[in-house]
Amino acid sequence: MRFSLSTTAAALAVSLAFAPGWAVAWEKDKTYDITILHTNDHHGHFWQNDHGEYGLAAQKTLVDDIRKQVAAAGGSLLLLSGGDINTGVPESDLQDAEPDFRGMNLVGYDAMAIGNHEFDNPLSVLRQQEKWATFPLLSANIYQKSTQQRLFKPYALFDKQGVKIAVIGLTTDDTAKIGNPEYFTDIEFRVPATEAKQVVEQLRKTEKPDIIIAATHMGHYDDGKHGSNAPGDVEMARSLPAGYLDMIVGGHSQDPVCMASENHKQADYVPGTPCAPDRQNGTWIVQAHEWGKYVGRADFKFRNGELKLVSYQLIPINLKKKVEKADGTSERIFYTQEIAQDPSMLKLLTPFEQQGKAQLDVKVGSVNGKLEGDRSKVRFEQTNLARLLLAAQMERAGADFAVMSGGGVRDSIDAGDITYKDVLKVQPFGNTLVYADMKGSEVEKYLAVVANKKVDSGAYAQFANVSLVADGKGVSNVKIQGKPLDPNKTYRLATLNFNALGGDGYPKIDTLPSYVNTGFIDAEVLKQYIEKHSPLDASQYQPKGEIVYK
């Protein structure tokens, strides 16, 4: 398949229900207009935020308008999601993302890729979500260990006016490492690129599609430099024979894939400005940031077996910028024209929002400054919010020190009142507090592993009551509670079951004789700590350079 670019491209891929058979093939010398719309990393944001940004109601209005435009021009349209529908907004989490899947039905999604956060719950919850969805959830590289069979549909087929489109779903094989090990006892995540090659070759022999799209949840890493993460879209595109994939529509890294130059994304993409997707080995690669902040739109022309991208854009969904006024005050204004909320979507989602808010808008405490939990911070440096979480865990477990993955801190808490919703946004996974007693010599070995997890990954460790120097291989100058580590003394470590079972590649400690799973949910532990110690002084939890990296 030959591609030529007029502007730029994208589409977050995944696939739809299997077609019973292909209709009449495309006609020679006839041009077919095909539009791919896409989103990814929705993470429970079915409702607009407090500033009136994004949300499925405005998304539906936009998508409906585009559908009308495309239909009027005689074209065809697919709407795809790159996965991670689950986890991030308490109103959604408490209802197992039912409002999100039902809302996606109403928007008219054709298919979605399965993301790693679809496994934040037991498989039974994901199976229920499949029932709620009127579109298929796809992944070609997730297998059941006991049967060696795929757990989900690997691809879906679409016939768009005789143009045959296959969409393959792929999930990061990091899922087994970054997800809850308790849920993966009979599940394995195989290498996506290997499975993609097999499926493409199968499709070429059997279905003979004109266009093949990989809907992936693997991440986009500039120039294929994925660090401690599993290889992503760029690496896969380079590893496959040229022409195997026409497009990769991705997610997971939660980036607007808008290239500034070859192999380098724009560092700070401004909503509403031009966006050029990546291209590797003849394959277009796209991603639409996160949370439904954008709908990606790729407009193609297909003629005589050639697919040409004529335009691409990321369309902001009511995103706003903060501007300072002459009187010293500030206001938020839209980057682009406001999109009205669809009444039918509001009617569907309002009961879910009300049910969730009734449980969540309860004040549990207050804080006099921001508690930092932004993704751009907790995966790179020690933060005061992580210290607060760990302080709560230490107090409940009677521990000497505590450790957790930075990726487990999911949001910040602003100064002012703290609600139960705020707590659940920070810790949405429902992990349990665990502890284990270890000799100082064992502690040093443990810290040597976790302290050297790479920055810019969810595994990056957050610490409390620990000071040390990490050099990439080991640790030195280790102190617990400000005192030098005694190799013969017994210390109690508090952490979460996710890490204790080997999540994020941490040493497994669940086999230690002293290991105890308290059964206390992390968010509930944090909630009770805040209630007990409010008003909180944010400065008391501020890191003071205890963790040094060489």
UniProtKB/Swiss-Prot annotation:
<keyword id="KW-0479">Metal-binding</keyword>
<feature type="binding site">
    <location>
        <position position="254"/>
    </location>
    <ligand>
        <name>a divalent metal cation 1</name>
    </ligand>
</feature>
<dbReference type="Pfam" id="PF02872">
    <property type="entry name" value="5_nucleotid_C"/>
</dbReference>
<dbReference type="InterPro" id="IPR029052">
    <property type="entry name" value="Metallo-depent_PP-like"/>
</dbReference>
<comment type="function">
    <text>Degradation of external UDP-glucose to uridine monophosphate and glucose-1-phosphate, which can then be used by the cell.</text>
</comment>
<dbReference type="GO" id="GO:0009166">
    <property type="term" value="P:nucleotide catabolic process"/>
</dbReference>
<feature type="binding site">
    <location>
        <position position="252"/>
    </location>
    <ligand>
        <name>a divalent metal cation 2</name>
    </ligand>
</feature>
<dbReference type="InterPro" id="IPR008334">
    <property type="entry name" value="5'-Nucleotdase_C"/>
</dbReference>
<dbReference type="GO" id="GO:0008253">
    <property type="term" value="F:5'-nucleotidase activity"/>
</dbReference>
<dbReference type="InterPro" id="IPR006179">
    <property type="entry name" value="5_nucleotidase/apyrase"/>
</dbReference>
<dbReference type="GO" id="GO:0008768">
    <property type="term" value="F:UDP-sugar diphosphatase activity"/>
</dbReference>
<feature type="binding site">
    <location>
        <position position="116"/>
    </location>
    <ligand>
        <name>a divalent metal cation 2</name>
    </ligand>
</feature>
<dbReference type="InterPro" id="IPR036907">
    <property type="entry name" value="5'-Nucleotdase_C_sf"/>
</dbReference>
<dbReference type="InterPro" id="IPR004843">
    <property type="entry name" value="Calcineurin-like_PHP_ApaH"/>
</dbReference>
<protein>
    <recommendedName>
        <fullName>Protein UshA</fullName>
        <ecNumber>3.6.1.45</ecNumber>
        <ecNumber>3.1.3.5</ecNumber>
    </recommendedName>
</protein>
<dbReference type="GO" id="GO:0000166">
    <property type="term" value="F:nucleotide binding"/>
</dbReference>
<feature type="disulfide bond">
    <location>
        <begin position="258"/>
        <end position="275"/>
    </location>
</feature>
<feature type="site" description="Transition state stabilizer">
    <location>
        <position position="117"/>
    </location>
</feature>
<dbReference type="GO" id="GO:0030288">
    <property type="term" value="C:outer membrane-bounded periplasmic space"/>
</dbReference>
<feature type="binding site">
    <location>
        <begin position="498"/>
        <end position="504"/>
    </location>
    <ligand>
        <name>substrate</name>
    </ligand>
</feature>
<feature type="binding site">
    <location>
        <begin position="375"/>
        <end position="379"/>
    </location>
    <ligand>
        <name>substrate</name>
    </ligand>
</feature>
<keyword id="KW-0732">Signal</keyword>
<comment type="similarity">
    <text>Belongs to the 5'-nucleotidase family.</text>
</comment>
<feature type="binding site">
    <location>
        <position position="84"/>
    </location>
    <ligand>
        <name>a divalent metal cation 2</name>
    </ligand>
</feature>
<keyword id="KW-0547">Nucleotide-binding</keyword>
<feature type="site" description="Transition state stabilizer">
    <location>
        <position position="120"/>
    </location>
</feature>
<keyword id="KW-0378">Hydrolase</keyword>
<feature type="binding site">
    <location>
        <position position="43"/>
    </location>
    <ligand>
        <name>a divalent metal cation 1</name>
    </ligand>
</feature>
<dbReference type="InterPro" id="IPR006146">
    <property type="entry name" value="5'-Nucleotdase_CS"/>
</dbReference>
<keyword id="KW-0170">Cobalt</keyword>
<feature type="binding site">
    <location>
        <position position="84"/>
    </location>
    <ligand>
        <name>a divalent metal cation 1</name>
    </ligand>
</feature>
<feature type="binding site">
    <location>
        <position position="41"/>
    </location>
    <ligand>
        <name>a divalent metal cation 1</name>
    </ligand>
</feature>
<feature type="signal peptide">
    <location>
        <begin position="1"/>
        <end position="25"/>
    </location>
</feature>
<keyword id="KW-1015">Disulfide bond</keyword>
<dbReference type="GO" id="GO:0046872">
    <property type="term" value="F:metal ion binding"/>
</dbReference>
<dbReference type="Pfam" id="PF00149">
    <property type="entry name" value="Metallophos"/>
</dbReference>
<feature type="binding site">
    <location>
        <position position="217"/>
    </location>
    <ligand>
        <name>a divalent metal cation 2</name>
    </ligand>
</feature>
<keyword id="KW-0574">Periplasm</keyword>
